[in-house]
């Protein structure tokens, strides 16, 4: 009070005091606005201003800008993608999803009209309180309690139907995605041939769930609020007109406030779609890191690599944590602005919008009769007070409902931007699946112009094809034989291993494939199996049903012991084929696995077979599958490397007796006698296809002995060279073993293994 008394008398006037307060407020806004807007917009301008020609991760700014341009946003591309996905959610006019949507819409409409009825009841209850009419109060309160029963049921039904709609959408998307994912070996090619989809498991699970939930929730958050706004505004206007109130100014105020709020929120809204899409991507990276550690836990434990793996895992988690913090920070300022506009500014505007009609109301409409007008003029003051109180309570309840609806509509824009992120990820998943199914592969997510596409007509060994690989070759299914005409072997990364391969394997021929590591042996099997495409040339081969591939590490499926033998058939398919358990037992006897049946407890025993069976047992189980399916051609990729020589010979002899043509990759000379032809790669893009007769075996054996003789002195010579370098204090001009490439080390290890096994197997060679 002492400070106030010392102010000049001019400042004590109400009008002057208001002007001073307004000036102080404007000055504060002027000083704080740069800080506020700077926080709201983030650090974008700073990053662009101080950016280097390369981004922090080495990415060119042009490419980074192009990626930002393609980031999810609410634009025409978003609506086009959403429409295509909605066609998957609603495949036909009469479907389950459309029926659920109809019931959901009916529940939302019912809730709107119940809200209007409850608002009128609120006004009636307040009127009875003002009039001090206890009997009427009890009657109106009873109505209010009775209407609560259907109202609560409708509220619960809305949530239930929204959950059912989310589940139906998810089921429809998952079904469609699985059909694409498991058609034409897409599940393999999307990870090994195409580089656009980093984490298919993330897209198939979490992204689909978030998209389905977002669509269902957004429908509720848009349909009901829009209906609420239309119905409540119509009710308010009709009520005001019936009492002769002014409806022009409230409508103008409402329009200005809503338009201003929408403009401000739109201007300062962060790009939630881009932020959410990036968060989902980083979640997928973190999940991949965890699954990678689980899949390679034994190797990591042998190396003692837990520290580096923990650092990589923490780095991935910290990346996700930074993204979540960024989203929370941007939401902090956005929600603050949103609450100020929608809670305080709208509340003040609502009071004005309610007060103006009540103050200007005459109590009758211009269309009313003279008797009604006179009755309104003759109404007692206490009745007028109760009528005004009822009108104020009803109008304010309806106006609050309308304001809440408008707020939800405007807040839904943030949800729409988040939906744009989920839509982009799900749409891109389907796009990649469809492209891969149609043979269109991209090794990165970057855009490439059509004229920059790769796979030229003429390729040479050692070159790398840049850009998307175009498939110009032909694959022709034939009844018998395998024939390659000018067939190149090109890896998914574009490396040309063999420029042109020409060979023919007729029925009854048994082909042995040899060569150093990385020369294209397994790559040829991938092409024959249809995993890799034929980029040029012509490949004649039987249908996939007549070819069976057995890798070095056979896959053990989830199921019974019987399921391991008949994989990938089911029990029903086995029965349709006419195979009995007795015949399966004979197959196990052929591969020396009969004891497994007794050890594991019969055909119906269920175990984690990849851990229960040893390496040799798993390889013999893979050969058992070959005898079950009885293909025309068996592609054997070192599939008996862990099997003893005697059992291996027994299995190969039985396969030949069964009429199965063998195409074998092996380093064991003991298997040469089971093959009639040889395909030898030299590792430099060259190859040799010839009949494997006695002279060929002798020449190969002579070459082997010569190499053994040359290699036997290498350790001593290397040791002597090291001693001389140490005495002279000089370094050797030859590369040390530690500097050799990884594939060369593997070649030496394989050669040493061949040398060690040569003596043991020499007596078995013909």
Curated annotation (Swiss-Prot):
GO biological process: adrenal gland development; cholesterol transport; fatty acid beta-oxidation; long-chain fatty acid import into peroxisome; motor behavior; oligodendrocyte development; peroxisome organization; positive regulation of myelination
Keywords: ATP-binding, Hydrolase, Membrane, Nucleotide-binding, Peroxisome, Translocase, Transmembrane, Transmembrane helix, Transport
Domain spans labelled ABC transmembrane type-1: 101-393
Main location: membrane
Cellular component annotations (GO), alphabetically ordered: peroxisomal membrane; peroxisome
Signal peptide: none
Transmembrane segments: 98-118, 138-158, 245-265, 340-360, 481-501
Cell compartment(s), UniProt: Peroxisome membrane
Positions of region (Disordered): 728-766
Chain sites annotated for binding ATP: 515-522
Catalytic activity reported: a very long-chain fatty acyl-CoA + H2O = a very long-chain fatty acid + CoA + H(+); a very long-chain fatty acid(in) + ATP + H2O = a very long-chain fatty acid(out) + ADP + phosphate + H(+)
Function: ATP-dependent transporter of the ATP-binding cassette (ABC) family involved in the transport of very long chain fatty acid (VLCFA)-CoA from the cytosol to the peroxisome lumen. Coupled to the ATP-dependent transporter activity also has a fatty acyl-CoA thioesterase activity (ACOT) and hydrolyzes VLCFA-CoA into VLCFA prior their ATP-dependent transport into peroxisomes, the ACOT activity is essential during this transport process.
Family (UniProt): Belongs to the ABC transporter superfamily. ABCD family. Peroxisomal fatty acyl CoA transporter (TC 3.A.1.203) subfamily.
UniProt-recorded name of the protein: ATP-binding cassette sub-family D member 1
Organism: Danio rerio (Zebrafish)
Gene, per the UniProt record: abcd1
């Amino acid at each position: 009070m002492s400070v106030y008394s010392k102010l000049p008398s001019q400042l004590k006037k109400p009008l002057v005091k208001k002007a001073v307060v307004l000036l102080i407020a404007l000055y504060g806004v002027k000083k704080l606005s740069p800080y506020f807007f700077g926080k709201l917009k983030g650090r974008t301008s700073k990053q662009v201003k101080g950016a280097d020609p390369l981004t922090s991760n080495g990415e060119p700014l042009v490419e980074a800008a192009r990626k930002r341009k393609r980031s999810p946003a609410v634009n025409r591309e978003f609506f086009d993608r959403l429409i295509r996905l909605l066609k998957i959610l609603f495949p036909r006019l009469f479907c389950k999803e459309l029926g659920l949507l109809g019931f959901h819409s009916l529940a939302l409409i019912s809730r709107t009209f119940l809200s209007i009825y409850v608002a009128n009841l609120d006004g009636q209850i307040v009127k009875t309180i003002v009039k001090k009419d206890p009997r009427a109060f009890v009657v109106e309160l009873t109505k209010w309690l009775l209407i609560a029963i259907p109202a609560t049921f409708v509220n619960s039904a809305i949530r239930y139907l929204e959950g059912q709609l989310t589940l139906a959408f998810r089921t429809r998307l998952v079904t469609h995605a699985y059909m694409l994912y498991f058609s034409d070996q897409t599940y393999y090619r999307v990870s090994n041939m195409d580089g656009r989809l980093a984490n298919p498991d993330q897209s198939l699970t979490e992204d689909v769930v978030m998209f389905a939930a977002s669509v269902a929730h957004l429908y509720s958050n848009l349909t009901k609020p829009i209906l609420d706004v239309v119905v409540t505004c119509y009710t308010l206007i009709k009520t005001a007109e019936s009492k002769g109130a002014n409806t022009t100014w409230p409508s103008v105020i409402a329009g200005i406030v809503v338009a201003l709020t929408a403009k401000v929120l739109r201007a300062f809204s962060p790009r939630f779609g881009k932020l959410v899409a990036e968060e989902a991507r980083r979640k997928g990276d973190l999940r991949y890191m965890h699954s990678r550690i689980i899949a390679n836990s034994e190797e990591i434990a042998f190396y003692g690599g837990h520290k580096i793996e923990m650092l990589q895992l923490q780095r991935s988690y910290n990346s996700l944590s930074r993204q979540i913090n960024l989203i929370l920070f941007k939401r902090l300022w956005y929600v603050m602005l949103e609450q100020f506009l929608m809670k305080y500014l709208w509340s003040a505007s609502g009071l004005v919008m309610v007060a103006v009609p009540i103050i200007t109301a005459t109590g009758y409409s211009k269309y009313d009769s003279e008797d009604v007008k006179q009755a309104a003029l003759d109404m007692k003051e206490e009745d007028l007070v109760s009528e005004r109180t009822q009108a104020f309570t009803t109008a304010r309840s309806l106006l609050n409902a309308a304001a809440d609806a408008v707020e939800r509509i405007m807040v839904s824009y943030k949800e729409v931007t988040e939906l744009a992120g989920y839509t982009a990820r799900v749409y891109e998943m389907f796009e990649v699946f469809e492209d891969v199914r149609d043979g269109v592969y991209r090794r990165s997510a970057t855009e490439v112009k059509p004229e920059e596409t790769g796979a030229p007509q003429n390729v040479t060994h050692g070159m790398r094809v840049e850009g998307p690989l175009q498939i110009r070759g032909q694959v022709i299914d034939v009844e018998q034989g395998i024939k390659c005409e000018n067939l190149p072997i090109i890896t998914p990364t574009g490396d040309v291993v063999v420029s042109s391969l020409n060979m023919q394997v007729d029925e009854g021929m048994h082909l042995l494939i040899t060569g150093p590591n990385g020369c294209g042996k397994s790559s040829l099997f991938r092409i024959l199996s249809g995993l890799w495409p034929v980029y040029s040339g012509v490949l004649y081969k039987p249908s996939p049903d007549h070819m069976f591939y057995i890798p070095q590490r056979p896959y053990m499926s989830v199921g019974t012991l019987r399921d391991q033998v008949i994989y990938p058939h089911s029990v029903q398919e086995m029965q349709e084929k006419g195979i009995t358990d007795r015949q399966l037992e004979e197959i196990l006897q052929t591969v020396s696995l009969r004891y497994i049946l007794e050890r594991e407890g019969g055909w119906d025993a269920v175990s984690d077979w990849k851990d229960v069976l040893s390496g040799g047992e798993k390889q013999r189980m893979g050969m058992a599958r070959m005898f079950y399916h009885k293909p025309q051609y068996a592609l054997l990729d070192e599939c008996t490397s862990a099997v003893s020589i005697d059992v291996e010979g027994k299995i190969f002899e039985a396969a030949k007796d069964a009429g199965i043509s063998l195409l074998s990759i092996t380093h064991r000379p003991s298997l040469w006698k089971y093959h009639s032809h040889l395909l030898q790669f030299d590792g430099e893009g060259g190859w040799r296809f010839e009949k494997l007769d006695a002279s060929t075996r002798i020449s190969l054996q002579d070459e082997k002995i010569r190499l053994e003789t040359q290699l036997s002195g290498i350790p001593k010579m290397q040791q002597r060279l090291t001693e001389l370098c140490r005495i002279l204090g000089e370094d050797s001009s030859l590369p040390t073993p530690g500097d050799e490439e990884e594939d060369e080390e593997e070649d030496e290890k394989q050669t040493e293994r061949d040398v060690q096994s040569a003596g043991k197997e020499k007596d078995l060679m013909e």
